Amino acid sequence: SPTETPNTPWHEPYRDASLLERYDEYSDHPIDGERAWVFYTELQKKYKYPEFDGENFITPAVTWNRMAHDGYKVRIYDDIIWVYEYQPDGLTASGNNRFIRRPQGHGLWLREKAEFMNDPFRKKMKMWYTFYCDHTSCEEAYRLNAKQCAEYIGAPVSFMYAMAAARKAAAAMKKVIKR
């Protein structure tokens, strides 16, 4: 309904915030739900969307995170300013597939987010592992090797090779246990 929102309300009419506050780990009161973002044209033009051969989508979070990292804030109103309808073939419906099919943009987004948020090494390792698992167990046409995963996510190649060995060992152990 036009009067319902998935957004968590707050008690002020608006809030000035960094777009990094969309992430739970960055803020005690993250900006959640569906919100409309409006930017000055001059600012948006300053932050170009990176392009990668063979990829036709990159999450807008790449440019938003860069703006936030450079100190820009947005004013978020606690009011419904737009009404939308999810489309069966829209971005939300395509879920993780849009990232799997565009691994360089996906890796750039995750790598920069970790850098801008000063993620500790252990958290980066979890992110690298998840990226590796997602991009090595997907449809054959989109599958990456360990070296590509390392390059796109900014991880040490040796870590990715260790992940490959660990996954093979785990799969072999599962087969043995099933017998």
Feature annotation, model-predicted:
Residues S1:
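Conserved phosphate/oxyanion-binding catalytic-loop motifs
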Residues V62, V74-R179:
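C-terminal subregions of glycosyltransferases and related glycan-biosynthesis enzymes
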Residues E4-A93:
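Conserved nucleotide-sugar donor-binding catalytic segment
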